[in-house]
Amino acid sequence: MTAPAPRLVDEFVHPALFYRGTAEYLKGTVPFIRDGLAVGEPVALAVPGSNLRLILAELGTDAERVRLLDMTRSGRSPGRIIPNVLRAFADAHPSGRVRIIGEHPWSGHPAREYPACAQHETLINVALADRSVTMLCPYDVDRV
């Protein structure tokens, strides 16, 4: 048996969180945020307003240490999400790892737009490949 290769400090990590319902959503997102805060990593939360409110209620005063963005506003123009939300936050913290939760506001989008959303996820991998970022992308399996 061989040991896993060590992770590079500046490695971009992009896990998905597939969830059903509020309990699973909070179980996957809140610890991600708190773990980052515990080790001194800047954290940004860019999710639709309804989910933003859920997480804020769980975080309590920890929310004061998180960059909060409502993706129903910040993500209205998909072409601006990478440069104005994701990359901007990463670039604002050039030394050390940052954490981002980025959830696209899927609800209300027609099925024909799904391929563009999938392409956007792939572009995120390219746009942040040179940054020390852990980006969690939640997907509500009942809506996607």
Label each residue range with its predicted role.
Residues 1-144:
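Non-catalytic regulatory/interaction regions at protein termini and inter-domain linkers
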